[in-house]
Design a protein with these regions (language model features):
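Aromatic "clamp/platform" in nucleotide-sugar-dependent glycosyltransferases that forms part
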Residues: 284
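A short, well-ordered alpha-helix in the C-terminal region of glycosyltransferases
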Residues: 337, 344-358, 367-370
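Conserved acidic donor-binding segment of nucleotide-sugar-dependent glycosyltransferases
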Residues: 316-317, 321-328, 337-342
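Conserved donor-binding/catalytic core segment of Leloir-type glycosyltransferases
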Residues: 158, 194-221, 234
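Membrane-proximal helix-turn-helix segments that form the acceptor-binding/catalytic region
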Residues: 136-157
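Carbohydrate-associated surface elements
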Residues: 163, 184
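Short hydrophobic beta-strand element within catalytic cores of glycosyltransferases
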Residues: 292, 301-304, 314
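Nucleotide-activated donor-binding/catalytic signature segment of Leloir-type glycosyltransferases, i.e.
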Residues: 246-264
Length: 384
């Protein structure tokens, strides 16, 4: 039997806007976050529909973990179609609330439809968009992000990190409209593997995109192997930059030490983390950096860049080490330190396990449910 909603006692009809669904080959941490939350809301008795972009071989409609997914055009047509598709959806099958998931191009739903709206914000791109997509798309994204404070003057928002909240406030969103709720973790799946020493395997996880800066990890591996000759690197993920990264590996003569796995199922990712001596995240910006917490839960400390999102998920010196962004030498030094200093490593592993135990998808779902009720109750009041 489905659980009843915890906050209002009434089942809500929810429409979610997010470019990708969980089956999209480009799905990442944002999509995991969306489905972990909304599948729980479905279990509590709510109905959830997601309007997402299509991709090669995708069915126009499907149901994933109880969430009904309707796919529109491809990623390039999707944002132009959303205003019309949303209005048609609401006209034929009304909803109690629309949830904008803000991590790519903003939807600006309050200007599109007269319906209660709230938002889940992973991160906004700002100028990092110019290092991920073509200039015209990046410019349009940056300009559209400037409209968010005007469209969402009184929209209840859930930010997944203090860094994201600070970015929203700096852009003009009222602090009282934002609650910070970090992602959760499946503690039943993410756990340490067999005890014993781990080989010096370094794992890097993420989409192979420019702003993720996997090239910095590859360059650092050259220095790391001078101190730890048997250090190896597994790069997990897919993306447009793979060819460029593979060429860099060849130029640095690291073919025998670097593995590109492509996209792999979650169970295999967990196996890598349970074997890893170290996780590295070199991204220029993250909403939170959930892979860091997943690694902590599997007994792998991390070295990450000191940037928004990652400085929220890493407790420097307690669960991992933070280094300056794109600093190859600093990354190499920190990685060698974790790989060779056993007392430090033991302290980071213990701190990481304790830290990871604090993250709960149920709490994140509770907060989302409360935000939805707030959006419905406050609709029509105007800015506060």
């Amino acid at each position: 039997m489905a659980q009843r909603p915890r906050h209002a006692g009434k089942a809500r009809r929810i429409v979610v806007l997010n470019e990708r669904d969980l089956e999209n080959p480009l799905a990442g941490g944002a999509e995991i976050h969306v489905f972990e939350i909304f599948r729980r809301l479905v279990e509590r008795g709510h109905s959830v529909r997601l309007l997402a972009a299509s991709f090669r071989g995708a069915a126009p409609t499907t149901t994933i973990q109880g969430v009904v997914v309707r796919r529109l055009g491809n990623r390039y047509r999707y944002y132009a179609q959303i205003p019309f598709a949303l209005r048609r959806t609401l006209a034929t099958d009304p909803a109690d609330v629309v949830v904008d998931v803000l991590n790519k191009f903003p939807f600006l739903t309050p200007w599109v439809a007269d319906v209660p709206c709230c938002a889940i914000v992973h991160h906004l791109f700002g100028t990092t968009a110019f290092r991920q997509v073509a200039f015209p798309i990046a410019l349009a994204t940056v300009l559209a992000e400037k409209l968010i404070p005007f469209a969402h003057q009184s929209t209840p928002m859930l930010a997944i990190s203090d860094s994201t909240r600070a970015d929203l406030v700096a852009r003009g969103i009222a602090a009282e409209h934002i609650v910070v709720v970090p992602p959760g973790l499946d503690v039943g799946a993410y756990a340490p593997g067999p005890r014993g020493p781990r080989s010096p395997l370094i794992v890097w996880i993420g989409r192979l995109e420019g702003y993720k800066r996997a090239d910095v990890m590859i360059e650092a591996l050259v220095e790391i192997r001078r101190r730890v000759p048997d250090a190896r690197l597994s790069i997990i993920g897919s993306g447009q930059a793979r060819g460029t990264l593979e060429e860099l590996v060849r130029r640095r003569r690291l073919e025998a030490a670097v593995e590109f796995t492509g996209f792999i199922p979650e169970a295999r990712k967990i196996e890598y983390l349970q074997r890893a001596a170290l996780l590295v995240n070199t991204s220029e910006k993250e909403g939170f950096g959930l892979t860091v917490i997943e690694a902590n839960a599997c007994g792998a400390p991390n070295v990450s860049t000191d940037v928004p999102g990652l400085r929220d998920s890493v407790r420097d010196g307690e669960t991992g080490l933070l280094v300056p962004f794109a600093d190859v030498a600093a990354l190499a030094r920190a990685a060698v330190q974790v790989l060779t200093d056993e007392p430090l490593r033991a302290r980071l592993v213990a701190g990481g396990l304790e830290w990871a135990a604090r993250f709960s998808w149920d709490r994140a779902a509770d907060a989302t449910e409360a935000m939805i009720e707030d959006a419905i109750a406050s609709h029509g009041r105007g800015p506060s």
